[in-house]
Amino acid sequence: MYFYNLVKNTDPEIAEAIKSELKRQQNKIELIASENFVSIAVMAAMGSPLTNKYAEGYPGKRYYGGCEYIDVVESIAIERAKKLFGAEHANVQPHSGAQANMAVYFAVLNPGDTILGMNLSHGGHLTHGSPVNFSGKLYNIISYGVDPETETINYDEVLKLAKEHRPKLILAGASAYPRVIDFKKFREIADEVGAYLMVDMAHIAGLVAAGLHPSPVEYADFVTTTTHKTLRGPRGGLILCKEKYAKLIDKSIFPGIQGGPLEHVIAAKAVALKEAMTEEFKNYQVQILKNAKALSTRLIERGFRLVSGGTDNHLMLVDLRNKGITGKDAEKILDEHNITCNKNAVPFDTQSPMITSGIRLGTPAVTTRGFKEGDMLEVADIIHDALTNSDTKENILIRVKALCEKHPLYKEFDE
């Protein structure tokens, strides 16, 4: 564990915390839909000497000297992002998905302008207009949700709201929506009311890159994403847009909302983007979907109710009300059995956001470990047994350990 040895002589407390976190990741089954495990190459790029360099500005136009190699790194990242997603322009500097979203808002909106976005409790994101977030404080937010019967987006309702409120920007994308989103339909709605169309594809970027989910790039004026999650890169953000908006977006990031970019993270983004161009990565994304189908199908067989009846992507929402257990309690119980997930509101939830009636499950991280469909059937059975007391805790922990040992994680660090 090279980083442990490098850190422990200076700071043994932090070194021990790092070591413990590695062991947690190795010995638990990670089902949080927004998490993944980066490659050693991505991790190494983040720990490189690039972290030492200030580089305010953009390649070829910096406010500091000595940026010639930084320019090489960032230019490669930009070109790879454009090529991977077929975009006219890319900004790789956002520190996070939230920063990417903020930059788009600040580029084309004024305080008080109207945004039409997905309700957080129906699968949206904090930055899509939640009243506790800057987006909900600065802008007039109109929210659309899912149909009570189908639990999928009702595009007729979105159009109706758009005609009624005439938003300046319509936002598509979600953090907990298990179905394919029709970006073409959103483009038609935006055109009908003269609105910008922005798509936040943070959760599905890897699937889009592999051609397994319709791409929003040809339809949206702006596309934002994180670079982790299904894209399996470092924690960070990315903005794609039409060339005509390039200067607006770049100015909005710097000097608008950020100062110096994190060039060590941008290097890691570049490495991850190169990995995403491989056949191996596409096969990985195919397996994510296969694993999600296997997990969701088995959970339904074991009596769990899935929001919308299943999944088209990497995640699923499990409504636990028929099991008489809250999302908060389920998260805690599963964690005690070495399975990590997160509590999550389900559409029309009556529980508070800190309690919830459901959990969100995803397959990107376990698929990176090498889990296949058969493993996911066992995972579903373990979830059932843990939440219904159908097996002893001791036996379940043995079953989880067997899966983790079958598919070791970062075994290079154990040498």
UniProtKB/Swiss-Prot annotation:
EC assignment: 2.1.2.1
Any one GO MF annotation of this record: glycine hydroxymethyltransferase activity
Gene3D superfamilies on file: Aspartate Aminotransferase, domain 1, Type I PLP-dependent aspartate aminotransferase-like (Major domain)
Pathway(s) it belongs to: One-carbon metabolism; tetrahydrofolate interconversion; Amino-acid biosynthesis; glycine biosynthesis; glycine from L-serine: step 1/1
InterPro entries linked: PyrdxlP-dep_Trfase, PyrdxlP-dep_Trfase_major, PyrdxlP-dep_Trfase_small, Ser_HO-MeTrfase, Ser_HO-MeTrfase-like, Ser_HO-MeTrfase_PLP_BS, SHMT-like_dom
Annotated site, Plays an important role in substrate specificity, chain positions: H228
Protein location: Cytoplasm
Record flagged with keyword Amino-acid biosynthesis: yes
Cofactor entry: pyridoxal 5'-phosphate
Membrane-spanning ranges: none
Keyword Transferase in annotation: yes
GO terms of biological process kind: glycine biosynthetic process from serine; tetrahydrofolate interconversion
GO cellular component: cytosol
EC category: transferase
Record key words, sorted: Amino-acid biosynthesis, Cytoplasm, One-carbon metabolism, Pyridoxal phosphate, Transferase
Assigned protein family: Belongs to the SHMT family.
Alphabetical list of PANTHER family matching this protein: SERINE HYDROXYMETHYLTRANSFERASE (PTHR11680), SERINE HYDROXYMETHYLTRANSFERASE 1 (PTHR11680:SF35)
Functional summary from the UniProt entry: Catalyzes the reversible interconversion of serine and glycine with tetrahydrofolate (THF) serving as the one-carbon carrier. This reaction serves as the major source of one-carbon groups required for the biosynthesis of purines, thymidylate, methionine, and other important biomolecules. Also exhibits THF-independent aldolase activity toward beta-hydroxyamino acids, producing glycine and aldehydes, via a retro-aldol mechanism.
The protein's assembly and partners: Homodimer.
Protein name (record): Serine hydroxymethyltransferase
Organism of origin: Caldicellulosiruptor bescii (strain ATCC BAA-1888 / DSM 6725 / KCTC 15123 / Z-1320)
